[in-house]
Amino acid sequence: MINIESSTVKEPADNLALSNAVRPGVVGWAKTIARELGPEGVTVNTIAPGRIDTERIKEVYPDGPTDEDLRAIPLRRLGRPDEIASVVCFLASDAASYVTGSVIQVDGGLIRSLL
């Protein structure tokens, strides 16, 4: 099982009180399910994308991200949808058979939290 969340699960965003309250609950649920389904060989992980170049990001940055926005991301660019897809493919593969209950950031280094 692979959940798609948001990098804001680790660093809440301003003006998104409801979203900031719900997202950690989804991660807690996923970690619980990972423990419950682990004995059956089922892995459960969550991907936390950062700023990905999608239609949604165009709503956030109608004129495109500014240089300041990009400087906040250590890799200095928006992510691409195929980069999220690559992580999904990895988690769905046998190579990730011992990865469960994890939250994997795919955010170019944007979020600075240690955990």
PLM regions and their residue ranges:
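Hydrophobic structural elements of the Rossmann-like NAD(P)H-binding subdomain
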Residues: 2, 44-47, 57, 101, ...
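Alpha-helical segment proximal to the catalytic Tyr-Lys
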Residues: 35-39, 97
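Short, flexible catalytic-loop segment of classical short-chain dehydrogenase/reductase
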Residues: 10, 27, 44, 48-59, ...
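A conserved structural motif in NAD(P)-dependent oxidoreductases
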Residues: 73-84, 95
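Active-site helix of classical SDR
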Residues: 22-23, 30
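Short C-terminal tail/terminal secondary-structure segment
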Residues: 11, 88-89, 100-115
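A glycine/serine/threonine-rich, flexible loop-to-helix segment
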Residues: 15, 39, 51-73, 83, ...
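Residue(s) in the substrate-gating loop at a strand-loop-helix junction
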Residues: 6
